[in-house]
Amino acid sequence: MKSKKSKFITKDILKEAIIESFKKLNPKYMMKNPVMFVVEVGFFVTILLTIFPSIFGDKGHNLRVYNLIVTIILFITVLFANFAESVAEGRGKAQADALKKTRKDTIAKLIGKDGSIKTINANELKKGDVVLVENGDVIPNDGEVVDGVASVDESAITGESAPVMKEPGGDFASVTGGTKVVSDWLKVEITATPGESFLDKMINLVEGASRQKTPNEIALNTILVSLTLIFLIVLVALYPMATYTGVKIPMSTLIALLVCLIPTTIGGLLSAIGIAGMDRVTRFNVIAMSGKAVEACGDVDTMILDKTGTITYGNRLAADFITVGGADKQKLIDYSVMCSLKDDTPEGKSIVELGKQLGITIDTKKYESIEFEEFTAQTRMSGIKLENGTAVKKGAYDAIKKRVQELKGVIPKDLDEAVNKVAKLGGTPLVVCVDNKIYGVIYLKDTVKPGLVERFERLREIGIKTIMCTGDNPLTAATIAKEAGVDGFIAECKPEDKIEAIKKEQDEGKLVAMTGDGTNDAPALAQADVGLAMNSGTTAAKEAANMVDLDSDPTKVLEVVEIGKQLLITRGALTTFSIANDVAKYFAIIPAIFTIAIPKMQLMNIMHLSTPYSAILSALIFNAIIIPALIPIAMKGVKYRPMKSEALLLRNMIVFGFGGIIVPFVGIKIIDMIITPMVRILNLG
């Protein structure tokens, strides 16, 4: 899977992150992160203890120096946590700045009701206004093409250098504000008010201005706050108990113990993980309307996938004409081409092209005044009505069969055989009829995208079921489904069938993802837990979905699901690591506190740390430096491998649980060896 590659951190991002780290020290801001707020409060208390070492009756050699060292380490701990968040935000802001360059003061050519053109600022445009955009002009806002055909450079938004053809109707009518017309002209009806375009939404999202905490983040934050309160209560109770038993514990040591035991590591990285998850999605050219949408991707159980464009290339091209009922093949080709002359779909154009290759010549002027009936999901057929009243139709087997039967026509005995022949080849059969007589079948050939079997197998390994939706008959659907490797399929699928399929899965407690681009997909996109709309699709589809793919690649839903899973795994892994850290820090600090008054506590000093003060400072230093050490993992995410939930849990428990115990044991011991000479020189204690 490809994404926009960028440096992990640039000089500009680093400089901005350092400045922001200091700005975030404001207690009002720190209160948003209760765990780190407790650390900051501890920092202010130790400042007081540095100035007045005996304020709580504490005694000891060079206590002021010891308190000062604890103060500095606590300050650095808070600063590192702010730095982690600032780096994540900085990467988003850098991307936003690049996008802002495309959002200049654009001039719009507003077309009046009388056809006159008035030049106004793009900010004055309203929904429903129609503007003229000519070669070299920047499209002033999101809209739908109502007239004209032109090439549009979307590289400012999508990163794709190749221009995209835009024309009225179909999948290529939608245009995005900030993109540039590089040939011809377009008339565009504005569909977004200023400040609410996709460019504006994208800038707000990557800047983090509109980022709200997700339900999982809130739940985890609640657990972290609860743990912090528990340890705070324990420490408050420990002080009088220790005093009663004759153990003198300096207040700064108690604060150090509290900071080391509360989950500061994950507390300092939690916001960065969430922001980084959104950042990874945007680097795949997907706009997520919220962090909740990205998280939902990680919990998806079922994926509803359109066959065309997602599983197959969607370029169904006419490959053959098959006659039935003894019909003349020349007439079948004539009628097929005739009812496709005004069909602007790729299928319709390919039928006309194949007819030309077979020597058919039709006077197109003769049919200019004839009305064309477009294909719809309800009728599942298209065609024309000649001046003499004759109706020439092409469409799905069951739709044409029903029409012919209603007109008292006869169904050729070899029709089923012809349809099944095409279906078994994985093609789509289009049946052609003139009034109540069926002439034959058009074989539309499509190709399954390579590599899907392996990708669906990966999804199956992590418990995600895939269902293919297609308007094809059951035989064709079964052939394509088997070739692609999906778990199930819905043949002859209508828009309402997709909604029913989604509701059925949701009623079983499953989360569902789906892709779509048409207005008829909008209800299903809104119903799905994860709805990924194509940027080339209709405005209705994009408004209904909670994610939009700027590249208009339906297969990207597979990558988005993996990003969501990676986000959840990263958060879970680092939480496990953070809590496991406490075990090692417990064995470092507890013996150090009590070993002087209770010599037998020395047995708990399994790391053989040199002195009580070196043990406390070593644990505190490790607690601070582990935060920036884990920033790359928080930003890039834990490496994701498709596997069963049980195996994934076991792997992460071994790597981040057991590793979360071993790493601090080793780290604290190394730090202790480094700082012991300094502790002895300062004669702390």
Curated annotation (Swiss-Prot):
Annotated residues that bind ATP are located at 343, 347, 375-382, 394
**Which residues act catalytically here?**
306 (4-aspartylphosphate intermediate)
The source's superkingdom equals Bacteria
Q: What is this protein called?
A: Potassium-transporting ATPase ATP-binding subunit
Organism in which the protein naturally occurs: Clostridium acetobutylicum (strain ATCC 824 / DSM 792 / JCM 1419 / IAM 19013 / LMG 5710 / NBRC 13948 / NRRL B-527 / VKM B-1787 / 2291 / W)
Keyword list, A-Z: ATP-binding, Cell membrane, Ion transport, Magnesium, Membrane, Metal-binding, Nucleotide-binding, Phosphoprotein, Potassium, Potassium transport, Translocase, Transmembrane, Transmembrane helix, Transport
What is the protein's known function?
Part of the high-affinity ATP-driven potassium transport (or Kdp) system, which catalyzes the hydrolysis of ATP coupled with the electrogenic transport of potassium into the cytoplasm. This subunit is responsible for energy coupling to the transport system and for the release of the potassium ions to the cytoplasm.
Among PROSITE patterns, the record links this protein to: ATPASE_E1_E2
Membrane topology per the record?
A: Multi-pass membrane protein
Q: What does the sequence similarity comment in the record state about its family?
A: Belongs to the cation transport ATPase (P-type) (TC 3.A.3) family. Type IA subfamily.
Any idea which GO molecular function terms this record carries?
A: ATP binding; ATP hydrolysis activity; magnesium ion binding; P-type potassium transmembrane transporter activity
Q: Which residues bind Mg(2+)?
A: 517, 521
Where can this protein be found?
Answer: Cell membrane
Q: Which reaction does it catalyse?
A: K(+)(out) + ATP + H2O = K(+)(in) + ADP + phosphate + H(+)
Whichever gene encodes this chain, its name is kdpB
Q: Which InterPro entries match?
A: ATPase_P-typ_cyto_dom_N, ATPase_P-typ_P_site, ATPase_P-typ_TM_dom_sf, ATPase_P-typ_transduc_dom_A_sf, HAD-like_sf, HAD_sf, P-type_ATPase_bsu_IA, P_typ_ATPase
**GO CC terms on record?**
plasma membrane
Q: Where are the transmembrane segments?
A: 36-56, 68-88, 218-238, 255-275, 587-607, 615-635, 654-674
Primary localization: membrane
In short, the EC number is 7.2.2.6
What is said about its interaction partners and assembly?
The system is composed of three essential subunits: KdpA, KdpB and KdpC.
Record-linked SUPFAM superfamilies: Calcium ATPase, transduction domain A, Calcium ATPase, transmembrane domain M, HAD-like
